[in-house]
């Protein structure tokens, strides 16, 4: 086991979990419920499980919503 190195002014929301030997850069924010298994540089905004940049999560959500919309549309076309 090892320690976690948090830079200055790091904000951890509730239920955040950080694995051993992880470094989080200064002025970073980790959103609620995030599980961190890799290092992040300064000024990071982190979220999810596993942890990713919040910007990356937003891109994933947009793609997922588009895919779900296409599935719903295709399903409606198949119904009598």
Region annotations inferred by a language model:
Residues 44, 51-80:
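Terminal amphipathic alpha-helical/low-complexity segments used for targeting or macromolecular assembly
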């Amino acid at each position: 086991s090892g320690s976690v190195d948090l830079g200055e002014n790091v904000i951890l929301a509730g239920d955040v979990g950080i694995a051993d030997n992880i470094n989080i850069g200064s002025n970073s924010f980790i959103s609620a419920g995030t599980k961190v298994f890799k290092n992040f540089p300064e000024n990071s905004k982190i979220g999810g499980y596993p942890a990713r940049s919040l910007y990356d999560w937003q891109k994933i959500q947009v793609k997922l919503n588009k895919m779900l919309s296409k599935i719903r549309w295709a399903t409606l076309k198949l119904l009598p």
